[in-house]
């Protein structure tokens, strides 16, 4: 089976559990830098799949970087996971979906990375809508 098919099979087989994660995050909207539930939920799923987790990234208590390294030469392929909500609007921005889909994509790719080499990285991006410490996205590139 091709690597692409292995990834697609993982996604198809597991998509409903990720939809459930997205719904749970949607039901508990958290503003920028307050995304305790959302970041913990995404981190827990990544840990279940052997990703190494760094937390409190770039001055953001709810930021994280999750890495799965095959140990083989190859590219680092990154996914940006946003998960903050809008004041008074909740997840009208869809970040519950964006964050969860990024984790699903990363874990899907992890299914073949030991065969093809490289590493998979998820940048957990709190406060994408801004906030007192600014967007984590901007902090990552400083």
Residue spans for each PLM region:
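Acidic/His- and Gly-rich active-site-bordering loop/insert found
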Residues: 3-121
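Fold-level recognition of mixed alpha/beta catalytic cores in primary-metabolism enzymes, strongest
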Residues: 121, 125-142
